[in-house]
Amino acid sequence: MERLLAKAFRKVALLALPAVVDTESLKDLIGRPRFLPESRERTAVPGVASGLAVTGMGGDVLFIEASLLPGTTSSLTLTGQLGDVMKESAQIALSYVRAHAAEHGISPEQLEHPLHLHVPAGAVPKDGPSAGVTMTMALVSLLTGRNVRAEVGMTGEVSLTGRVLPIGGVKQKLLAAQRAGLTDIYLPQRNEPDLDDVPADVLADVRVHIVSDVREILETALGPAHTSSAVAA
C-alpha cells in the first residue's frame, strides 16, 4: 500500500497544482490492480482448494484442482509442471484420503475411478511439500461434494497419518493471502513462532488457525455437501 501511494504522489507532483485525486484519477495514477481476488470464482465447485506458495516474486495463491475421471482403474494423474517433491505430496495426500475414506464420508467406489490433480499456471515449474494439505483438501472436497470455503487459504506439508508439518515462507504467504482477500488461513502449529515476523496490519486482516492435524482443517474449511458427491473441478 505504501509503495502504491508513493507512486501516486510522485505522479501528482508532476501535475499542475493544486491537484485533486479522486477514485477515478487514482486508478490512472497507480494503474490496474496487480492482484485480482479470484478465490470465490475458482472454489465455486467442489474439488478446488486455495493454497499459499512462495515464488521468486514473493508469496502467491496456488489453486489445486481435483477431478474424478470415467473409468474403473484407480490411478492418479498429475499436471502443472510439478517437481518430484510435489508429486510425492500428491501421492501422500491420496494415500491419506484412501486410508481415512470412511472417516470423511467418502465411498470406496469413488476411489476406484481415476483421479486427476492439476495446478494451474502450467508453464511455471512448481515444487516443494507445502501444498500437501491443499491437495488433501481438494481431494476430500471433490469426493464429498463439499466446496472449500472461498475465504480459506492454507499451507502445510501433510503426512500419511494426517499430521500437518512445518513449511517456509510464512510472512510472504500471509501477505499473498491478504492481497487475495483470503481471511481464514490454516498454518502448521510448528510455524506459529513465524507469525512474529508478519506485519501487524496483515494479522489484523486475516484469522490464522493454528493446526497440527489435517482433520482440523477438514472440520471447518468445507461448506455443505452438494447434491452430487463427485463434481469435477
Q: Model-predicted segments: where are they?
A:
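C-terminal helical "lid" of AAA+/P-loop NTPase domains
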Residues: 2-14
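Peripheral, non-AAA+ core regions of ATP-driven protein-machinery
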Residues: 18-24, 32-50, 57-233
